[in-house]
């Protein structure tokens, strides 16, 4: 009996120290590993006492304590294990894990080890991106685009209708005057015979044309109503930064015998400076700087470009001065010229090789009041300016230069033509040389493409004879020049 007590005493001490050992053992391994996989032969020396009730304690391991929170007191007679608050929390956590596993169906997860505390839910709940949510903030780009498109369409309709109303208001106020001075008003050019339509011809949403003809000393008169691009939203926004005004341009083409040879222009300072640089006739025949018209009683805002002083004295009579003084704010430019060819023609290769075609023309440009905020009543205020156009046609027909003025005008035109020929002489020589080289190249290609050798030889001999004759002619000319020089 005494020997049995000595055998049981070491076993009891080992069992008391087992919880601490198992806690450290479980910490060294992952939770998913099964502790039962390890061999129990380490405790084979205690198999003889398997009938002892203490062995049952080994089969049912106590709760796993925290290593730092479970003090162990070794004593020869007894051992006590105290659980602190941390142990209770650990046991509560295990209970929560167990409750989570109980939610699953036992039949579906048959054979699954419920004691595995390392199981975690692998489902990942991702948040929906903000741009995929169904809210108005997700469509702000589409809303802006639709709003801009609607604004453009509304502005197009409103601007087009306003230009149409302004054009119709101008025509209604000027129709009686035009029909009393011209036999044909409003020919659209669609029919072979000239017919009076009595209405404006719309070129686009902001330009309207009116052709009039059938008057003494006048081939025809083209009136262009150049309104602002009110139908274009971008143009409307640009005009907020830089306001502009509508314009009415009148171009009268006279017969050759109904106008003398002179060039004259009057208008605002800015317009005269620009036209002198851009217009072909003003840059050639009016080389002097624009002069003030204070001598004739016109406002300082208007300047004059004239080929001769005699022309200015003849044009600026009392009635013409009255028109210019009363409507100086509406007059952009007035241009009379027998050499009118439009703006300068700039070619890529240089000066044009031919003088531009000229016509005797009267050109008027008027500004519509309002600076863009034009009303139909403002179009009625342009009627006196149309009376000035009719008066200018009759005035130019009656204006004739004296003998000295006529000779000076002819010398000016001869000088301009001579300067033009000098400027284009080198270009004409280069063009002639290029044509000769192209002709020779074409002749050589024709000879080389000839299949008959005999015919090819005859063509080469004929080409050589032509070249020889040309050389002989040049030599004869050189001899004649030397003889004349002697």
From Swiss-Prot:
One of its GO terms (biological process) is protein insertion into ER membrane. Keywords: Coiled coil, Endoplasmic reticulum, Membrane, Signal, Transmembrane, Transmembrane helix. It comes from the Eukaryota. It is a single-pass type I membrane protein. Residues 160-486 are lumenal. Residues 47-99, 422-486 are annotated as: Disordered. Its main location: endoplasmic reticulum. The keyword Endoplasmic reticulum applies. Pfam families: CCDC47 (PF07946). The chain crosses the membrane at residues 139-159. The keyword Transmembrane applies. Residues 476-486 have a biased composition (Basic residues). GO terms for cellular component: endoplasmic reticulum; endoplasmic reticulum membrane; multi-pass translocon complex; rough endoplasmic reticulum membrane. Component of the multi-pass translocon (MPT) complex. Belongs to the CCDC47 family. Component of the multi-pass translocon (MPT) complex that mediates insertion of multi-pass membrane proteins into the lipid bilayer of membranes. The MPT complex takes over after the SEC61 complex: following membrane insertion of the first few transmembrane segments of proteins by the SEC61 complex, the MPT complex occludes the lateral gate of the SEC61 complex to promote insertion of subsequent transmembrane regions. This is PAT complex subunit CCDC47. The gene is ccdc47.
């Amino acid at each position: 009996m005494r020997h049995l007590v000595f055998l049981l005493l070491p076993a009891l001490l080992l069992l008391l120290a087992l919880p601490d050992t198992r806690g450290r053992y479980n910490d060294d391994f992952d939770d998913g590993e099964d502790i039962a996989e390890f061999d129990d032969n380490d405790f084979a020396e205690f198999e003889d006492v398997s009938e002892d009730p203490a062995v049952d304690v080994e089969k049912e391991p106590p709760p796993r304590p925290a290593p730092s929170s479970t003090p162990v007191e070794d004593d020869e007679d007894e051992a006590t294990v105290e659980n602190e608050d941390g142990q209770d929390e650990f046991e509560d956590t295990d209970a929560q894990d167990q409750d989570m596993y109980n939610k699953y169906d036992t039949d579906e997860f048959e054979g699954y080890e419920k004691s595995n505390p390392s199981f975690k839910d692998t489902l990942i709940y991702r948040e929906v991106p903000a741009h995929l949510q169904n809210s108005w903030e997700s469509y702000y780009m589409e809303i802006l685009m639709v709003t801009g498109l609607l604004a453009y369409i509304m502005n197009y309709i409103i601007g087009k209708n306003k230009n149409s109303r302004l054009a119709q208001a101008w025509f209604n106020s000027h129709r009686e005057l035009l029909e009393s001075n011209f036999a044909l008003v409003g020919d659209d050019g669609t029919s072979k015979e000239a017919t009076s339509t009595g209405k404006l011809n719309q070129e686009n949403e902001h330009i309207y044309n009116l052709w009039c003809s059938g008057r003494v000393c006048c081939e025809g008169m083209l009136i262009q109503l150049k309104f602002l691009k009110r139908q274009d939203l971008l143009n409307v926004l640009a005009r907020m930064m830089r306001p502009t005004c509508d314009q009415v341009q009148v171009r009268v083409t006279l017969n050759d015998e109904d106008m003398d040879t002179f060039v004259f222009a009057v208008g605002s300072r800015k317009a005269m400076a620009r036209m002198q640089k851009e217009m072909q006739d003003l840059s050639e025949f009016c080389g002097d700087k624009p002069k003030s018209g204070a001598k004739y009683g016109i406002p300082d805002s208007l300047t004059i470009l004239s080929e001769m002083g005699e022309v200015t004295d003849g044009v600026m009579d009392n009635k013409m001065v009255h028109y210019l003084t009363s409507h100086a704010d509406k007059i952009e430019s007035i241009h009379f010229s027998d050499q009118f060819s439009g703006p300068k023609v700039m070619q890529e290769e240089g000066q044009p090789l031919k003088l531009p075609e000229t016509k005797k023309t009267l050109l008027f440009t008027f500004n519509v009041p309002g600076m863009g905020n034009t009303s139909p009543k403002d179009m009625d205020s342009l009627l006196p300016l149309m009376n000035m156009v009719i008066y200018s046609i009759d005035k130019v027909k009656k204006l004739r230069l004296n003998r000295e003025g006529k000779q000076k005008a002819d010398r000016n035109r001869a000088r301009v033509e001579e300067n033009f020929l000098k400027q284009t002489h080198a270009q004409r020589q280069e063009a002639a040389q290029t044509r000769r080289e192209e002709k020779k190249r074409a002749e050589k290609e024709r000879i080389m493409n000839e299949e008959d050798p005999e015919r090819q030889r005859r063509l080469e001999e004929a080409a050589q004879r032509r070249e020889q004759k040309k050389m002989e002619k040049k030599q004869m000319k050189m001899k004649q020049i030397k003889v004349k020089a002697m």
